[in-house]
């Protein structure tokens, strides 16, 4: 079953959709400021596209404009959310309930706006999910506020932030979860990781070149590996 939506959302637009069934697809290509976009999928095997979408060859989810609010809810297993986001003052709420889901976002990969002053909240309940976030991949993204809340086992978080001052809070409950984080830029960043569960894997790099980085980890559990690198431009290091 295929459901395709391709709106042109203008200023002060409000967009909301609920899809109930398996193997649905949502296509959104939005341009314009101050849009409020709410997407919800219930069931398994669904896709919100962009990037390199599969199934019905979607592409994109492509959001261009400032002061946007994006609310994503995928409730079920084996769902996929993919997209490119361009613009300052982006507020994102992302909720995933289920197993084996996949989330991939690039924020301003072409250095169009700089994605300054963004606020992302990601809530995950389930296991063996994979999340990839590249924020400010070409440009410095100032004053990012990023919050992850993850409950489940075997999840992987991989995020790369090219930041100009950022706050990153990650709360994980469950065993065998992995955090791969790289923060780089000029104005430093704050990263607070709180984790409960065994067999965890942390690979954390803070690479601000002209300012201080701050890292706080509270971890409770047995087994696993932790690699932390803070480097402001000195000799190459590794674990």
Question: Can you annotate each of these PLM segments?
Answer:
Residues 2-239:
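Long, low-complexity, polar and repeat-rich extracellular regions
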């Amino acid at each position: 079953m295929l459901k395709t939506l391709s709106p042109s959302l203008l200023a002060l637009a409000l967009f909301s959709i609920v899809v109930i069934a398996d193997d649905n697809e949502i296509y959104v290509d939005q341009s314009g400021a101050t849009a409020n976009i709410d997407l919800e999928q219930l069931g398994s095997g669904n896709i919100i596209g962009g990037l390199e979408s599969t199934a019905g060859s979607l592409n994109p989810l492509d959001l261009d404009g400032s002061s946007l609010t994006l609310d994503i809810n995928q409730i079920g297993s084996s769902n996929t959310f993919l997209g490119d986001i361009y613009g300052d003052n982006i507020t994102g709420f992302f909720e995933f309930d289920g197993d084996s889901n996949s989330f991939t976002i690039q924020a301003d990969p072409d250095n169009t706006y700089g994605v300054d002053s963004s606020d992302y909240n990601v809530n995950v309940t389930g296991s063996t999910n994979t999340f990839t976030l590249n924020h400010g991949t070409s440009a410095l993204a100032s004053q990012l506020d990023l919050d992850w809340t993850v409950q489940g086992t075997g999840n992987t978080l991989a995020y790369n932030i090219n930041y100009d001052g950022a706050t990153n809070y990650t709360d994980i409950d469950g065993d065998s979860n992995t955090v791969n984080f790289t923060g780089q830029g000029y104005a430093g960043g704050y990263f607070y990781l709180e984790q409960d569960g065994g067999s965890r894997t942390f690979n954390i790099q803070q690479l601000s070149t002209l300012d201080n980085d701050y890292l706080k980890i509270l971890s409770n559990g047995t087994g696993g590996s932790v690699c932390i690198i803070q480097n402001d431009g000195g000799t190459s290091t590794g674990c």
